[in-house]
Each structure stands twice: as C-alpha cells, then as structure tokens.
Amino acid sequence: LTTGENTPVAVGDVLNASLAAGTAATLYSSATGTSGVSCTSSAFTATVTANPAAPGTASESLTGHTFDTGGCTSNVVGVLGVSGITVDNLPYTTAVSSDGTITVTPAAGSAVQTTVRLRTLLGTITCVYQAPALTGTASNADNSIAFTKQHFTRSSGTSLCFSDGYFTAKYAPVTDTSLPGGPVVHVG
C-alpha cells in the first residue's frame, strides 16, 4: 500500500472510503436478481496492521463498516422499508495482495455477519446473514475496493428474510486519513 510517489502507508494509519459516486451497495436474494436491499450511503474504516514491500500482502483491521439507512430501500414483497443495517463481529482482518486481491476474514470461530432490520405491516423483523469470508478486488485505476455478489446465508429471521444474500458494493476512493489532505491509497 502506497500514497503519492510510492510512499509506503505507515502501520497504524487509518484508511477510509465511501461508496463510489453514483453507485449503491446491494444485498440481493439471488446472484442474478434485483430483489432485496439497496443503500446509496455506506463507508468503511480500517487500520493498517502490516505493510510489507510488494509483492507482499498488506494487512488491515476493519474496524467500521456502516450503512446510512436513510439511503436504504427494499423492493421485497411485504417489506415497507429498511430500519437498520449493522455489521457485526468486528473487527475483521483484511488481507490485500499486491495483485489487488482482497480477503476479509472474521476472528477464529466467528463469521462475517450483517443484521438487517426491515419494516413490515406486522412490525419490524430482524434478518441475520453470515458468510465465512469475503473476497474483493482493489484497483489503482480509481483507488477502489469492490465486492461482487459475495454470498451470505440467512442464519436467523422469518420467511420474509430471503434465505440467501448476495452483496455487491464499490468503495472509492480509498484514502489515508492519517496524512494531511487524505491522499489516495494505491495497491502494489
């Protein structure tokens, strides 16, 4: 991970990114469908824990991953709206390879978990989704991190909670907020 003219990002620096302009984070009920939840405001925060020279693999501690539910909608039949989305079991470990491959893993014995609260005519329901890990891609073209159709399974919730969730989101630009001006971060 570097900033500017190949300056290595320091261990302990805090990285941040929001959704790429004009995009949405989605959790759809199938890999090919468009039924589910969509949010236009989301962000993540991570702290760099290791940053060896390329071709090494950098490590980060993902300490925050938020969704502004004011920008979230759902088109699931029977659902009136989204009252909350929480990413649980933080922090996660994020490994960033010099080729741009990203792997997000939870603590041992845990899971990547998201709790979605949906408003229905019968009240608010809680849907919990889990995945063993997530895989994404970092790109220097726009200093982005993207996740595409990452598969979650429902671990609890009523029948209104779809049984599978496929998460897609693109965050850009990733910046180093520990440095003046928050320069963008490059991989490799």
Q: What residue spans do the PLM features occupy?
A:
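Predominantly extracellular/secreted and cell-surface proteins with exposed
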Residues: 32-140
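A detector of low-complexity, intrinsically disordered, Ser/Thr/Gly/Pro/Ala-rich segments
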Residues: 1, 5, 112-113, 118, ...
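Intrinsically disordered, low-complexity, charge-dense segments enriched in Lys/Arg
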Residues: 137-144, 149-151, 157
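Alpha-helical structural elements
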Residues: 87, 122-124, 147, 162, ...
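N-terminal segment immediately downstream of the Sec signal-peptide cleavage site
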Residues: 1-61, 66, 151-188
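Generic recognition of long tandem-repeat/solenoid scaffolds
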Residues: 11, 16-21, 101-115, 143-149
